[in-house]
A protein has these predicted regions:
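Long, mid-chain structured domain cores
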Residues: 1-14, 18
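Short amphipathic alpha-helices and their capping/turn segments at secondary-structure boundaries
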Residues: 14-33, 76-85, 164-171
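Divalent metal-binding pocket/active-site signature
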Residues: 28-137
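Glycine-enriched alpha-helix->loop->beta-strand junction motifs that scaffold or abut catalytic
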Residues: 86-89, 117-121, 140-146, 173-174, ...
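Short acidic/histidine-rich active-site segments
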Residues: 93, 125-126, 171-193
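Histidine/acidic-residue-rich catalytic or RNA/ligand-binding cores of hydrolases
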Residues: 102-109, 132-141, 157-165, 185-202
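His/Asp/Glu-enriched short active-site or ligand-binding loop at hydrolase and phosphoryl-transfer sites
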Residues: 146-157
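Mid-to-C-terminal alpha-helical segments outside catalytic/metal-binding sites
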Residues: 173-175, 190-232
């Protein structure tokens, strides 16, 4: 969140945050929202306005700025509400990341109570790897939950095949999406696509041989592009 929010009164800060989100969709044609709260205060999120008000005034600092966990949690919950209101996906970073990630607080399952009755669309990006089985089960259990395998390809290299296999064993196929999480170097995108195409083909062939699916090409196309096109 922008540190300038802390220069406003609590109610004004929340109002400004909400209006900014709505404008991004309505006026700037954003496709959805993304949270990296896993990098800040983790995914053990509590939606409590009183706690948010108290933490808003707390001046405890972290490397990223004011900690204000209760306030950050509250804005996360507000984002869920607005994403549902505007019918756009809300991506949430889960699992491993850069060296500043709070990995012990980034397990997808920490979001279980928040998504249990949620009627919007939550995307667990990076499939929560290495906690991808949790993401797959959540996608199976809760209508609101989707996942993508960005970052797994190419950074998990050959483990990407295992991740795809394990995710597709549990999650509905129409809830799994390819992604790369690539940046800066175009070669990373190329390697990601190359590995994904290889392993999704191998996994789909295995599933067809085991008679779990009857059309491997359809499954490949769904995960590679169709699911994301429908969601976004």
């Amino acid at each position: 969140i922008n540190e300038k929010l802390f220069s406003l009164p609590f109610d004004k800060a929340v109002e400004f945050f909400e209006e900014t989100l709505r404008n991004k969709i309505r006026k700037e044609n954003y496709a959805g929202f993304k949270s990296i709260i896993a990098y800040r205060t983790g995914l053990k999120i509590i939606c409590n306005e009183d706690l948010a008000r108290n933490d808003f005034l707390d001046e405890e600092m972290e490397w990223f700025g004011r900690k204000a966990k209760g306030f950050r949690d509250y804005l996360f919950c507000k984002t869920m509400e607005i994403a549902k209101e505007l019918d756009v996906p809300f991506q949430v970073h889960t699992g491993a990341g850069d060296r500043d990630i709070k990995l012990e607080l980034s397990r997808p399952s920490y979001l279980t109570d928040l998504v249990r009755k949620y009627e919007g669309k939550i995307v667990l990006v990076h499939a929560g790897f290495p906690y991808h089985r949790e993401s797959a089960w959540m996608a199976y259990l809760f209508p609101s939950v989707y996942l993508d395998v960005s970052q797994v390809f190419p950074f998990a290299t050959t483990a990407g095949k295992d991740v795809l296999r394990e995710v597709l064993q549990i999650s509905p196929i129409n809830k799994v999406m390819y992604g790369s999480d690539t940046f800066e170097l175009p070669e990373i995108a190329w390697v990601s696509a190359k590995l994904f195409r290889k392993y999704i083909t191998e996994v789909a062939e295995e599933m067809e041989r085991e008679e779990i699916i009857d059309d491997k090409e359809k499954v490949i196309k769904m995960v590679a592009e169709e699911n994301a096109s429908k969601l976004y």
